[in-house]
Design a protein with these regions (language model features):
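Active-site environment of non-heme Fe oxygenases that use a 2-His-1-carboxylate facial triad
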Residues: 10-12, 92-123, 129-133, 138-139, ...
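Fe(II)/2-oxoglutarate
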Residues: 1-126
Length: 349
């Protein structure tokens, strides 16, 4: 019979010698009730009961009094209490962190001016490099909007439709973290502005710097260990990636933020003794992302589009009061093309 022990005042479950943290188990419930936002879980989350049911384990979480069932084989396959070898930020040059106060200074430029004047184009591209996003206004032809904007610096890569039901908003997140490489630029427009659906933006670099100031140990945990992301929702596709939530260059410069709990797979690349620290930082990062002081909210009116750095800026949506679905259209491009165009303009101006 499997050995079952609840330890550390309910924070740890031991199964056949393998230890699992309560918060890790709660984050990986197998009944479709994975928390939409990690920050909403109780800070004093623990285990009140664990009962063997055949080849499965029934666990009760406190203080939620929520029961979840885990297959023993699944726990064995995802065990992280095993010896693993491990070894061990500053903002990149030309980048400026921002928070809610930046809402009154959103960079924007009209498309005709971007096409006509290299100085305007340079300032607009430089704003994306500095702040991670910028608006385009005065888009006349909706069908050609993406082609015209992306053609300012790169070939169009990929077009997709994105719909959001009116009754639900979307927590800020980076797009497609399961892709490798992750799409680095995202261009977004609202096809029906009259239905609402304001955009929420968060500077992931600013959140990372804040976490580093508050909890250096937790910051190191998120930069030194991989998270896993997966999307198997489409038939014939199984997309997976394995990267840090906060990725640094070898010299310590902030490089990429990958944060999207919707596509997070079980964390198994963190030592048992580091898992609580990891989740403490993961949870705090989620709280910062959801904090109004780190967010700006802006509408996308008719004839407007938003280009954002998907390796830095987290994007969400506010819920709409309309009974109809808001409809957004987006496409991806690669940031190296933008930086190349920017460098060429810097050399010529």
């Amino acid at each position: 019979m499997p050995e079952l022990l609840i330890e550390n005042e309910g924070r740890v479950l031991r199964v056949n010698g393998q230890r699992f943290h309560a918060i890790w188990l709660r984050d990986n419930v197998q009944d479709g009730q994975r928390p939409a936002a990690l920050a909403t879980l109780p800070a004093n989350l623990g285990l009140s009961a664990a009962v063997l049911r055949g080849d499965s384990l029934e666990i009760t979480f406190a203080p939620e009094d929520k029961t979840a069932v885990f297959a023993l084989q699944w726990l064995k396959d995802h065990a992280y209490d095993t010896p693993q070898e491990r070894s061990e930020g500053h903002i990149p040059a030309n980048c400026t962190p921002w928070g809610a106060g930046f809402a009154s200074a959103v960079p924007a430029a009209p498309l005709p001016a971007l096409l006509a004047y290299e100085a305007t184009k340079y300032s607009w591209l430089d704003a994306i490099r500095s702040f991670g996003f910028a608006k385009v206004t005065e888009l006349v032809d909706r069908e050609a909007a993406f082609r015209d904007v992306v053609a300012l610096f790169a070939p169009l890569c990929e077009l997709q439709q994105d719909q959001a039901m009116s009754s639900h908003g979307q927590h800020p997140a980076t797009a497609a973290p399961y892709r490798e490489p992750v799409p680095s630029l995202k261009l977004l427009t609202n096809l029906n502005p009259s239905l609402g659906g304001e955009i929420i933006l968060v500077d992931g670099f600013a959140c990372a710097l804040r976490l580093m100031q508050e909890d250096p140990e937790g910051f190191t945990a998120l930069t030194a260990h991989s998270n896993r992301f997966a999307d198997t929702s489409r038939q014939g596709e199984a997309l997976h990636s394995r990267r840090q939530i906060i990725e640094l260059l070898p010299e310590g410069t902030l490089q990429t933020i990958r944060f999207n709990p919707r596509f997070a797979a079980p964390v198994t690349d963190v030592l048992f003794d580091r898992m609580e620290t990891y989740y403490r930082a993961y949870r705090r990062f989620a709280e910062l992302v959801d904090s109004p002081e780190m967010q700006i909210t802006l509408p996308l009116a008719a004839g407007e589009a938003l280009l954002l750095d998907n390796t830095r800026v987290l994007q969400g949506r506010k819920s709409s009061e309309s009974e109809n679905a808001c409809q957004f259209q987006s496409c991806f491009a690669q940031k190296d093309r933008l930086l190349s165009a920017l460098a060429a303009l810097e050399a010529s101006l």
